[in-house]
Amino acid sequence: MPIPTPYEDLLRLVFERGTPKSDRTGTGTRSLFGHQMRYDLAAGFPLITTKKVHLKSVVYELLWFLRGESNVRWLQEHGVTIWDEWASETGELGPVYGVQWRSWPTPSGGHVDQISAAVDLLRTDPDSRRNIVSAWNVGEIPQMALPPCHAFFQFYVADGRLSCQLYQRSADLFLGVPFNIASYALLTHMMAAQAGLGVGEFVWTGGDCHIYDNHVEQVTEQLSRDPRPYPELVLAQRDSIFDYTYEDVVVKNYDPHPAIKAPVAV
């Protein structure tokens, strides 16, 4: 059975056909607009194999989002520094992903816990077409250190299986997207477990899909490698989606090619 390669296919497409564009960071990119990737989560956990992805950072970042945090201190305490470039001297990032997921402000002064609401809706009305979580709070974007790149996601249940579709407005294909795929695949597994469902698909939809000009050498190396089978995710049982710990997430048979380092465009 051939190994699915939607990520590598998109990486190659943008590498070969992307339009040269300027960008906020001043680095320069080659870019294509609008693309979709689909992953059957029952067939394997989509942790990219053409380079090693730092799973510890993926897991701790997702747990940090689920905690509703706005400060990088908790990440740093667990050895994860992927948000440090955008944080203030005190570690603050403003009302970024986790804050919006867990504490979206309402006009009356209250807050909405979108994750709790999503779990409840999966349990009580799995066919709802309104099960959406958004980090794109227009009124609070000026206060954010970085506006959300992965902006909102929707859950869908069919035949007892949970699928998730993410819309990512800005997709750094080499550095960011492998993290995002793994993170939302993991979140889908967690949400499915909370609702007593199996897993279906993770659907990734990208807006500005780009490769930075200072990642060209690294992308060339990655595209020269043959993909390997995806690993298996084993997730511990937890009563609440907010109870998961790093030790609850076990990935078996991950056999990637070596990691490839590259600079982050800030």
Curated annotation (Swiss-Prot):
Question: Which molecular function GO terms apply here?
Answer: thymidylate synthase activity
InterPro entries in UniProt: Thymidate_synth/dCMP_Mease, Thymidate_synth/dCMP_Mease_dom, Thymidate_synth/dCMP_Mease_sf, Thymidylate_synthase, Thymidylate_synthase_AS
Q: Which UniProt keywords apply?
A: Cytoplasm, Methyltransferase, Nucleotide biosynthesis, Transferase
What start-end ranges are recorded for coiled-coil regions in this protein?
none
So what does this thing catalyse? Answer: dUMP + (6R)-5,10-methylene-5,6,7,8-tetrahydrofolate = 7,8-dihydrofolate + dTMP
Q: Where does dUMP bind?
A: R24, R129, R130, R169, S170, A171, D172, N180, H210, I211, Y212
Q: What is any one GO biological process for this UniProt entry?
A: dTTP biosynthetic process
Quote the EC number: 2.1.1.45
Family stated for the protein in its record: Belongs to the thymidylate synthase family. Bacterial-type ThyA subfamily.
Q: What does this protein do?
A: Catalyzes the reductive methylation of 2'-deoxyuridine-5'-monophosphate (dUMP) to 2'-deoxythymidine-5'-monophosphate (dTMP) while utilizing 5,10-methylenetetrahydrofolate (mTHF) as the methyl donor and reductant in the reaction, yielding dihydrofolate (DHF) as a by-product. This enzymatic reaction provides an intracellular de novo source of dTMP, an essential precursor for DNA biosynthesis.
**Protein name, per record:** Thymidylate synthase
Q: What is the lineage of its organism?
A: Bacteria, Bacillati, Actinomycetota, Actinomycetes, Mycobacteriales
